[in-house]
Regions:
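Cationic, low-complexity basic patches in intrinsically disordered or flexible, solvent-exposed regions
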Residues: 384, 401
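A short, charged helix-loop
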Residues: 209-236
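N-terminal glycine-rich flavin-associated loop
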Residues: 84-107, 133
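A gly/ser-rich beta-alpha-beta helix-loop segment of oxidoreductase catalytic cores
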Residues: 122-145
Length: 407
């Protein structure tokens, strides 16, 4: 159980409800390893919808529970501890639908978000290109206006959920006037001109592929926000979900720690349990300390956003950077504590070792997170951190409540 000061009763209730998800989700990872990647991905969304988790990704006006970041982080931590595949598919369900929530396009939101909330539709976020990874503004996919339509042409790569998606949010260049002249469009998976051209095999299998847009004619009504607002929507989405990547890292790390505690108490060498040796105790202590520190950064960032912060750039970057790097170290120690079993195909920690690696890359590499944090620190007139502002607001609210006479 997680005991942190950032939760209220609804978060504690959700956390208690999400304990022991392994029987639901862990078999999905095994099925993906056996080649049933798409089937396992679809079943992961069905399970998440059954648990009510997909509603966490959608505003209340469209059948959701309200985009509460602490709840999303609790969900991702619990799901990731059971299955990296299920976490990936669930996370991209949110990543691909959140720009619709941000855009203010009510007609599109009504059409797509209700089906996301109940799991009938699966979303994907199509931004990365062969020459546009960390440099997202280098997008080359074009969207040319033609009457009441836009015609999209380009290639997207490493698009998670691509092979099971019902729709994509596609980012494309609508002008050469500026590097940021990018717009976002909702494109149905079966829309003429959009094709999956190549599945991409990853060290931890999940539904991911390259897609091509060739003379793909999309109604202008499917544009999210104004023309040229795509980068704002993309960065706003990544700011929100980046914190939850840190939560997923905590889930993988917590599972690695649990597996290690059990292993060192049952495994005997030189006549004693491994848990009796000082080096083993030191490793466990370091793992637990790093996990707690990561959780504090993650749920601090989530609380900050839920308390009303408009920007979460610094806090979310810190949470993702530290949590994903700490998780890598924790899982690596778990492999070491398991010895040969730790690198045997089919063992839990071997799977965790493969699943944890991508977290330091997607939604902004660790190197990019460091640049983002440094940029915030070195700004000519750095503002107080979002956490400081949120804390001041919370304190002022509490002080006002304390000043009110008792009924």
């Amino acid at each position: 159980m997680i005991h942190l000061p950032f939760f209220d009763d609804r978060h504690r209730t959700l956390h208690a409800r999400l304990q022991n998800l392994a029987p639901r989700f862990e078999p999905l990872s095994a099925r993906a390893e056996a080649g049933e990647v798409d089937e396992a991905g679809r079943d992961a969304i069905r399970e998440c919808a059954t648990l009510g988790l997909c509603r966490l990704l959608v505003p209340p006006d469209f059948g959701g529970d309200g985009l509460d970041l602490r709840s999303l982080c609790l969900a991702r931590e619990a799901v990731a501890a059971a299955s990296g595949l299920a976490d990936s598919v669930f996370a991209v369900q949110g990543l691909g639908s959140y720009p619709v929530s941000l855009s203010g396009n009510h007609a599109i939101a009504e059409r797509y978000l209700r089906r996301v909330a109940d799991g009938r539709s699966i979303a994907a976020f199509a931004m990365t290109e062969p020459e546009a990874g960390s440099d997202a503004a280098a997008i080359a996919t074009r969207a040319a206006r033609d009457g009441d339509d836009y015609v999209l042409d380009g290639i997207k790569v490493f698009i998670s959920n691509a092979t099971i998606a019902s729709f994509f949010v596609v980012f494309a260049r609508t002008s050469d006037a500026s590097k940021r002249a990018i717009s976002a469009f909702v494109v149905d998976a079966d829309h003429p001109g959009l094709t999956i051209t190549r599945r991409q095999a990853m060290v931890a299998p999940h539904p991911i592929a390259e897609l091509r847009l060739a003379n793909c004619r999309v109604p202008a009504a499917h544009r999210l926000g104004e023309e040229g607002e795509g980068m704002r929507l993309a960065l706003g989405t990544l700011d929100f979900f980046r914190t939850s990547v840190g939560a997923a890292a905590c889930g993988l790390a917590a599972r690695a720690l649990d597996e290690s505690r059990a292993r060192v108490q049952s495994r005997r060498q030189f006549g004693s349990p491994l848990a009796d040796f000082q080096l083993t105790k030191a490793a466990l202590a370091d793992m637990a300390t790093e996990l707690d520190a990561a959780r504090l950064l993650v749920y601090r960032a989530a609380w900050t956003r839920d308390t009303g912060a408009e920007r979460l750039t610094r806090e979310s970057a810190m949470a993702k950077l530290f949590a994903t790097e700490a998780a890598q170290r924790i899982v690596d120690r778990a492999v070491q504590l398991h010895g040969g079993l730790g690198v045997e195909r089919g063992s839990v920690v071997e799977r965790l070792y493969r699943e944890v690696r991508a977290l330091r890359i997607y939604e902004g590499t660790s190197e990019i997170q460091r640049l983002v944090i440094a940029r915030e620190l070195l700004a000519p007139s750095p503002e107080p951190s979002a956490f400081a502002k949120a804390s001041a607001f919370a304190k002022a609210t509490a002080d006002k409540s304390a000043d009110r006479p008792s009924p």
